[in-house]
Amino acid sequence: MKFSQAVIALAAATVVSAQLPDVPQCSLPCFLDALTTDGCSELTDFKCHCSKPELPAKITPCVKSKCPVAEQVSVSNAVVKQCSEAGAPVSIPPVEESSSKPSEPSTSEAPTASPTESTPAPTTPAPTGTGSPSGTGAPGGPSGTGTFTNTGVPTQSTPIYTGAASGLSANIGGMGAAILAIAAYL
């Protein structure tokens, strides 16, 4: 019995991953649970899933507990896109930066604390110096004299571009989720 449940979970995780390739791996268990228990007859019937008003309310807390904020935004965008393409647009509240606890209702009361001034931290000037090279080089190697001046101004390096390979991790992640689903049911 457990083996058949594992096979079903694997198939469902694979379908969810294939249908929602932009969804981060951390959220796949949330979708798997929500999409297999919402009463829709097929896992890939996103028009049915998206028409269920409880879908965002069921997936959101799970995603908040399993994914970092950046990936929560990706999940939100993917759900809105998938539901719109299926013909059943949904509205999902924006992801809050501090997702470690549930948001509390806002009030119209005035703030109780007043702004304070802060003193900037003292700065230490960057060291500068001049120097002359000394020593001898290898025979036949470069030679000469010169000076070195340190301006104390740091330079910024260019960030690494991951290119199209960054999208590959989402598809590979789906297989990882499928394997985890099998392990959970065994």
Curated annotation (Swiss-Prot):
Keyword Repeat in record: no
One Gene Ontology term of the molecular function aspect: metal ion binding
Record has Chloroplast as a keyword: no
Positions with biased composition (Low complexity): 96-131
Polar residues composition bias: residue spans: 148-159
Alphabetical UniProt keywords: Cell membrane, Cell wall, Disulfide bond, Glycoprotein, GPI-anchor, Heme, Iron, Lipoprotein, Membrane, Metal-binding, Secreted, Signal
Start and end residues of each stretch annotated as Disordered: 89-159
Signal peptide bounds: 1-18
Domain CFEM, residue spans: 19-108
Maturation propeptide residues: 164-186
Superkingdom, taxonomy of origin: Eukaryota
Lipidation positions, renumbered (GPI-anchor amidated glycine): 163
Subcellular location(s) of the protein: Secreted; Secreted, Cell wall; Cell membrane
Biased composition (Gly residues): 132-144
InterPro entries named among the record's database cross-references: CFEM_domain, Extracellular_membr_CFEM_dom
GO cellular component: extracellular region; plasma membrane; side of membrane
Post-translational modification: The GPI-anchor is attached to the protein in the endoplasmic reticulum and serves to target the protein to the cell surface. There, the glucosamine-inositol phospholipid moiety is cleaved off and the GPI-modified mannoprotein is covalently attached via its lipidless GPI glycan remnant to the 1,6-beta-glucan of the outer cell wall layer.
One Pfam family it belongs to: CFEM
Membrane-related topology note: Lipid-anchor; GPI-anchor
Disulfide bridges in this chain: 26-67, 30-62, 40-48, 50-83
Residues binding heme: 45
Domain notes: The CFEM domain is involved in heme-binding and contains 8 cysteines and is found in proteins from several pathogenic fungi, including both human and plant pathogens. The CFEM domain adopts a novel helical-basket fold that consists of six alpha-helices, and is uniquely stabilized by four disulfide bonds formed by its 8 signature cysteines.
Annotated PANTHER family: CFEM DOMAIN PROTEIN (AFU_ORTHOLOGUE AFUA_6G14090) (PTHR37928), GPI ANCHORED CFEM DOMAIN PROTEIN (AFU_ORTHOLOGUE AFUA_6G10580) (PTHR37928:SF2)
Family according to the record: Belongs to the RBT5 family.
Known role: GPI-anchored cell wall protein involved in stabilizing the cell wall.
Stated name of the protein: GPI-anchored hemophore ARB_02741
Provenance organism: Arthroderma benhamiae (strain ATCC MYA-4681 / CBS 112371)
